[in-house]
């Protein structure tokens, strides 16, 4: 059976919000196949002279949401990110292709089977696909949440640069099976349970001990260096490599 060919489609920007000093969130309406938490999509821009620039962005919205939400970090000299963060306006259209990706997805059945305890570790904008997983889980039944306790470790430079900070705190306050720990590398922590240091193997060990669960699945997303550090630390914590799903982002566009 041949795989479905993904085609470019026009998506209209319906909402824009500058959510942190470096990140802009965009909500787009587009007729795409339903996505699975953890997937991404391609965005393509075409200049009047025909020049095209393309970039992949993780989907932040939960499966079934009426709009596709992207969180775009403004990168120096980034062709696509500069347009989306600084120029794009509500009502504009961009080309989208997706959803894409099958190795970084979280999609348990309604019993929570094949899930178990889930550890999420994100650095910077690497939290975006993890946010789709968190939202997907929050929308599931109590039985699924109970069968898949979750810990999110999220590292950013400062409190102000934590994307989805308030929403994540609210999830934790309303769900005893969801645990959240922030780490900030250049600013003070704002909650006693958090950490104001780089996410190291020792810090990871401390957070896992407080969690008290054995991760059956691990999702980590961030820069190449961040993901390498986390995956190495996880293996040292005796988490089998086959349980770890990693997604890296580059530094262009």
Language-model segment annotations:
Residues 2-92, 156-158, 183-187:
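Ferredoxin-reductase
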Residues 117-119, 218-219:
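Conserved beta-strand elements of the Class I
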Residues 3-9, 150-253:
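Reductase modules of NAD(P)H-dependent flavoproteins
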Residues 138-149, 241:
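Phosphate-handling active-site elements
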Residues 38, 126, 223:
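Short, conserved phosphate/pyrophosphate- and ester-handling motifs at nucleotide-, phospho-/glycolipid
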Residues 99-113:
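A short, basic/flexible loop-to-alpha-helix module at the beginning of a structural domain
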Residues 46-50, 98-103:
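Short, charged beta-turn/beta-strand-edge "cap" motif at the junction between a beta-strand
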Residues 127-142:
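Histidine-anchored nucleotide/phosphate-binding helix
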